Design a protein with these regions (language model features):
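Short, polar/acidic, helix-capping and beta-turn segments at strand->helix junctions
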Residues: 1-115
Length: 115
């Protein structure tokens, strides 16, 4: 079963890639590794989830933002491997950043949205 089929079974779909908004490459392949540039919670129809957790955004908003970011990462991987998911052996590192107020303490629940 392909990654895209597994996502479809979960009601998820990889987004179409948009051109970068700046002077950077979305991914770089080097010595069998693919490095993905930072990906954010960009919505399929345009725009993005913006704001701070604990100040207008709740845990569910944050988890959805993490999920969207993860889908964007997978879309970049798909582009890097030419849709041949067999080339993907493992994801070595995933780093999540959470914009939150100082009193917000549920960072793991937010980043878990990328799982």
């Amino acid at each position: 079963m392909t990654i895209e089929k597994k996502l479809e079974d979960l009601g998820l779909v990889l987004p179409d890639l948009k051109p970068p908004l700046g002077a950077y490459v979305p991914y770089l392949e080097r010595d069998g590794l693919v490095f993905i540039s930072g990906q954010g919670p960009v919505l399929a129809g345009g725009g993005a989830i913006c704001g701070r957790l604990g100040d207008g955004l709740d845990i569910e908003d944050g988890a959805r933002a993490a999920q969207l970011s993860a889908l964007n990462i997978l879309a970049q991987i798909r582009a890097a491997v030419g849709s041949d998911w067999q080339k993907l052996v493992r994801i070595v590192r995933l780093c999540g950043y959470v914009n939150a107020t100082p009193d917000f303490t549920h960072h793991p629940a937010v980043v878990n949205g990328a799982s």
